[in-house]
Regions:
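Phosphate- and other anionic-substrate recognition elements at nucleic-acid/protein interfaces
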Residues: 1-177
Length: 177
């Protein structure tokens, strides 16, 4: 399974692609928009870059970091807007989307939902067997998100399928009685 992960941000948007079968890095980067442009132009720039990554890497799933409340309203608005265009790009490309919170990502990668950025970065480097930690932190965060989905997301999917199967089985048993 190929996972494209997006750590949304208006000025810097981290992106990373990993292959789950080998837990290997395919690509990592940061999408940027100029703060000198109007908001709609910045979003359009990021949208085009996200679609470029989708077309280039052909992911099976797109993981987007769930926006959480931040003290700076301008920052959270830009982050939420980029998350929204990420979801739209995935939907229009007919690619499944999953969302994970920052604490879910930290817990999946380090075992601690309150881990510090440097702890997450070191684990990303180890898990993906990288020579160095990707820079800037937005790129590392995207890779951590991709790892989280591989480890946590696929488990959640198996659990959901098993639950649905059991509900169907129980329903059939009830209808026979």
């Amino acid at each position: 399974m190929r996972v494209l992960a997006i750590d949304p941000g208006l000025t810097r948007c981290g992106v990373g692609v990993i292959e789950s079968s080998s837990m290997s890095l395919i690509a990592v980067g940061v999408l940027k928009s100029s703060p000198d442009l109007a908001i709609e132009q910045r979003l359009n720039e990021i949208d085009g870059q996200i679609r470029g990554w989708i077309n280039l890497h052909n992911p099976d799933v797109i993981a987007v970091e769930r926006v959480f409340s931040q003290a700076n309203l301008r920052t959270v608005m830009g982050t939420a807007q980029v998350a929204g265009i990420s979801l739209l790009a995935a939907a229009q490309s007919e690619i499944k989307v999953v969302m994970h919170t920052p604490s879910e990502v930290k817990a999946a990668v380090t075992g601690n939902g309150r881990a510090k950025k440097d702890q997450v970065a070191m684990m990303v480097q180890r898990i993906l067997k990288l020579k160095e930690i990707p820079k800037p932190v937005d790129a590392t965060d995207a890779l951590a998100l991709a790892i989280c989905h591989v480890w946590r997301g696929s488990g959640d999917e198996r659990l959901a399928k098993a639950t649905a199967k059991e509900k169907t089985r129980l329903s059939l048993l009830r209808s026979r009685s």
